[in-house]
Design a protein with these regions (language model features):
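Peripheral, non-transmembrane regulatory/ligand-interaction domains of membrane transport proteins
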Residues: 1-161, 167-168, 177, 181-184, ...
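Conserved catalytic-core motifs characterized by acidic clusters
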Residues: 166, 171, 236
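Hydrophobic alpha-helical transmembrane segments and their immediately adjacent juxtamembrane loops
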Residues: 183-275
Length: 275
């Protein structure tokens, strides 16, 4: 009640709201933040990550919350306890509610960033474990915040349009400040999304590098022992006109030839820096 210098909050039952015709839309099954301009009010819903959704309806001097999950109630109690407005009004009230609802968002985003950095260090240390599942879980949470801030920005834009004429220029200035705050949080969420993508690409690069190392080892082993396979296949034919088969030192000679072949092959690979 700006004319009397008062800001009053009532807790009312649903049936008490019906006669006034100021009833928020049902939030049952609500999946995103929205604002709708109707003839008699500005109404919509807010779906905040990790909290129960709630609905709201605004007329010229009244704000009604449908808050069965208890999301807004702590904010109203804190405002009643701590805030002392020089000029109580609709805009400053909504601004303070939104500020309190998003006060922990930066902390939540910082925690997600910490988890992403931890996964990145896990990749660099070569310990993958359940990396894929953990990264996908973090990415899903990041995407929830990305969509949430985009929806909030659209919702605040509806308030800035002021189609019902409920808000003063000072109210619109506060709404614009909050929209800029939401924009910064949205940019932070987008940065986390890109960080997730970079960590995934790093994981794929490390995976490809490991596979290349394995293929390199297999190629070297095949190259080293291919001549020995040729010797084994050659002398395994046991032709009678092979003098080495009946030679007294034939077995020892084959061992020496095989060892010399392996040594020369390894030396050649190292000289060519292939190993």
């Amino acid at each position: 009640q700006p004319d009397r210098g008062l800001a009053v909050v009532w807790t009312m039952r649903e049936e008490q709201l019906l006669p006034a015709g100021v009833m928020p839309p049902s939030v049952r099954g609500a999946r995103f933040c929205k604002a709708e301009r109707r003839k008699e009010c500005l109404c919509g819903a807010m779906v905040i990550p990790g909290r129960e959704p709630f609905g709201y309806a605004i007329t010229g001097d009244t704000v009604v919350f449908q808050d069965s999950g208890g999301t807004v109630r702590p904010c109203l109690k804190q405002i009643a306890k701590e805030q002392s407005w020089r000029e109580p009004g609709l805009g400053i009230f909504l601004y303070d509610v939104w500020e309190l609802l998003t006060s922990d968002d930066l902390k939540q985003l910082s925690e997600l960033e910490r988890r992403i950095t931890k996964l990145e260090n896990t990749v660099l240390s070569g310990v993958s474990g359940a990396f894929h599942q953990n990264l996908m879980a973090v990415r899903r949470k990041v995407m929830v915040y990305v969509r949430y801030y985009a929806q909030m920005a659209d919702m605040i834009y509806k308030f800035l349009e002021n189609g019902n004429g409920y808000f003063s220029q000072e109210d619109l200035r506060l709404f614009q400040l909050f929209r800029e705050r939401i924009g910064r949080l949205g940019e932070e969420a987008q940065n986390l999304r890109e960080h997730c993508l970079q960590v995934w690409e790093l994981f794929q690069a490390e995976l490809d590098l490991r596979q290349n190392r394995i293929m390199k080892v297999l190629t070297i082993v095949t190259t080293v022992f291919m001549p020995l396979t040729l010797l084994v296949g050659w002398y395994g034919m046991n032709f009678h006109n092979m003098p080495e088969l009946s030679w007294e030192h034939g077995y020892l000679a084959m061992i020496l030839v095989s060892g010399l072949t392996v040594f020369l092959t390894i030396w050649l690979l190292k000289k060519k820096k292939l190993w």
